[in-house]
């Protein structure tokens, strides 16, 4: 379990580097100037919340990302939670990135296609593009 915890943090850093590379190559849908992690209070849930990646272009536009380093495929709940947490902010234009070690469930893929403003990236595809 300790290796997975360690690799989770390493994977987050890989995802951030991937987004910077996407930005520099003009392939990122959000032209952000800052990128980092966010921790804060969720008044609806009355508890702490975290977002692995928050990248801001301006006061209206941002990218929200979640990074999952697990042996299970990232499911619909991961995307739904990210969307819910993004609603703590007042950005009008949002794009979501989900990164996963082993890919995504069918439900997650289908919802991402319906939403249009979601990019899914698994580790293998990311490494091929870097």
State the predicted function of each range.
Residues 1-130:
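A cross-kingdom feature that marks ATP-driven nucleic-acid transaction machinery
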């Amino acid at each position: 379990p300790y290796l997975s915890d360690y690799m989770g943090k390493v994977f987050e850093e890989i995802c951030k580097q991937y987004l910077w590379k996407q930005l520099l190559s003009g392939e990122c849908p959000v032209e952000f100037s800052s990128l980092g992690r966010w921790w804060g209070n969720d008044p609806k849930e009355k508890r702490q919340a975290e977002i692995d990646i928050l990248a801001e272009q301006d006061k209206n536009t941002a990218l929200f990302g979640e990074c999952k380093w697990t042996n299970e495929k990232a499911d619909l709940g991961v995307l739904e939670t990210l969307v819910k947490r993004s609603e703590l902010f007042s950005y009008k234009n949002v794009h979501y990135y989900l990164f996963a070690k082993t890919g995504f469930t069918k439900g997650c893929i289908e919802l991402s296609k319906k939403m249009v403003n979601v990019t899914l990236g698994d580790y293998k595809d990311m490494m091929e593009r870097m």
